[in-house]
Amino acid sequence: MATHKLLLLPGDGIGTEVMAEVKRLIDWLNAQGIAHFETEDGLVGGAAYDADKVAITDATMAKAQASDAVIFGAVGGAKWDGVPYEARPEAGLLRLRKDLGLFANLRPAVCYPALADSSSLKREVVEGLDIMIVRELTGGVYFGEPKTITDLGNGQKRAIDTQVYDSYEIDRIARVAFDLARKRRNKVTSMEKRNVMKSGVLWNEVVTRVHAEDYKDVQLEHQLADSGGMNLVKWPKQFDVIVTDNLFGDILSDIAAMLTGSLGMLPSASLGAVDANTGKRKSMYEPVHGSAPDIAGKGLANPVAMLASFGMALRYSLDMGELADKLDAAIAAVLAKGLRTADIKSEGSTVISTSQMGEAILKEMQALHA
């Protein structure tokens, strides 16, 4: 049985509480001989700053480089608002993404049948929803230069941000999207603003070329990003895989997130390039929700997104798709029984704590392996 090396970075706030439920599941999988995980813990974010005055140490980064996957909790909180900019908690997350070369962000938006009434949209619009948004993570306007604010000397200022994409950056993210679609419902929707942005013209051109060269078996459509945002709300089940740039991906993935009813339900993955020698890629998995310091330590946090992020690691980094399917089924079964953390409570449901939710999901996993 293969040994999988995992680096666990709980971070701040509720990160430690939801990560505890992943550890509980890992311990059980190891004890049952279902899988073999070697885990190491590390500090990141505010916890790392308190200990070492940096958001992540070089030693922890070395562990991340050596791992098969990084499992990340959440960082940040008002406690660290006054720390130097380069040491702010979020800098640890950004360094992980940069140094591991994580260019592809995968954000699934899945609406469990038991939670369809928690969405702000009608049940018939969102029930059965299963979208994967593939966001380019290391290019675009967030990283382009120049990025300045200039005093014009006449009482006015000018701000400049620069949207930059090279062909290879678009090519590789497109391939991630097409490969995912082949394992799903075989459809990719590419979103950009080619009508007003040159980067959108190039994006459309490269995605179209990659499709024609290597993925003719996958259905490809193009939508302008603003129209795509409208369609995400109007008719979301038309989408399978959406691929888009950094800025639009940031916006569209948050829109898709709220179709499902709660940020506490949503996992994500960030992937690097496939190593030509090993066939593996650097990766990090994290819930979409933040550190939520206002509820930290109260047992109110929803661990589903953290557990589902571990499920994505099983599927995309550890070649354990069957086990990931069972974890997804366990989560769905718990929700179908009406068990809820406070963020997803509804009339007639039973509200339980973070640890009780983790325990309930583990019991369903045990039943599936009986």
Curated annotation (Swiss-Prot):
Subunit field text: Homodimer.
Organism the protein comes from: Rhodopseudomonas palustris (strain BisB18)
Any one Gene Ontology BP term: L-leucine biosynthetic process
Keywords for this protein: Amino-acid biosynthesis, Branched-chain amino acid biosynthesis, Cytoplasm, Leucine biosynthesis, Magnesium, Manganese, Metal-binding, NAD, Oxidoreductase
Pathway: Amino-acid biosynthesis; L-leucine biosynthesis; L-leucine from 3-methyl-2-oxobutanoate: step 3/4
Textual note on the cofactor: Binds 1 Mg(2+) or Mn(2+) ion per subunit.
Gene, per the UniProt record: leuB
Subcellular location: Cytoplasm
GO molecular function: 3-isopropylmalate dehydrogenase activity; magnesium ion binding; NAD binding
Enzyme Commission designation: 1.1.1.85
Keyword DNA repair: no
The protein's name: 3-isopropylmalate dehydrogenase
